[in-house]
Amino acid sequence: MAYVNEQNPQFLLYNGMHNQTHSTPQYHNHHHHHHQSPTYPQSYFNPYSHQSYQQHHLNSDVNFQMVPQSTSVPPDPFCSIEPMETNVQAKEQILEEIVRECEEIERRSNSSASPASNWSSDEHDSQSEKSYHPYKTPEKKERKKAQNRLAATRYREKKRREKEEAMTCIEGLSVTNGKLKDQVSELEREIRYFKKFMTEMGMKTVTD
């Protein structure tokens, strides 16, 4: 019983808990005070088994120390990196899908634009042909033929005038060419005359 009252640091926690939870019993009978000893809960103290009490006290210390460790562990700063990377990858995949869809839409619109434009041009041509060739009566057909004959006659007359003008120009140029040739012949004749005159005057050495 002496080891319970000693100032052993291993029993400070137990003594404090015992003082808070179990107060020292008051003994009113002074006659039996020397015969009675303070009683303790059997679950915490056994005077005949100090080893089992010490083991129970150590286990309680271990449990008391492990509780704050489980709650005081700081969160891992890197635990949120993987979700962030996952979110970034998901956003990039969404953007890539949007870009591919836009390119596909643009490609389809470009591929469908050319047939549509061709169809519209063909339709416009057919409409113009219909407007140019409406349903004709025999009178309109004769009138159209007369207009075509008149246009052909005007075209042939125009070509004939152009041809006559060209021939007139050719004739004028031919006359001018003949005159120039005559002038050349006259100049050559005069050159020969002056050479002969200078030879007769003894000016041959000078001319040479």
Curated annotation (Swiss-Prot):
Pfam families: bZIP_1. The gene is atf-4. Disruption phenotype: RNAi-mediated knockdown abrogates an increase in hydrogen-sulfide production in an mTORC2 subunit rict-1 mutant background. It comes from Caenorhabditis elegans. PANTHER family: ACTIVATING TRANSCRIPTION FACTOR ATF 4/5 (PTHR13044), CRYPTOCEPHAL, ISOFORM A (PTHR13044:SF14). One of its GO terms (biological process) is positive regulation of gene expression. Gene3D superfamilies: 1.20.5.170. Induction: Positively modulated by global suppression of translation activated via integrated stress response. One of its GO terms (cellular component) is nucleus. It is found in: Nucleus. This is Transcription factor atf-4 homolog. Keywords: DNA-binding, Nucleus, Transcription, Transcription regulation.
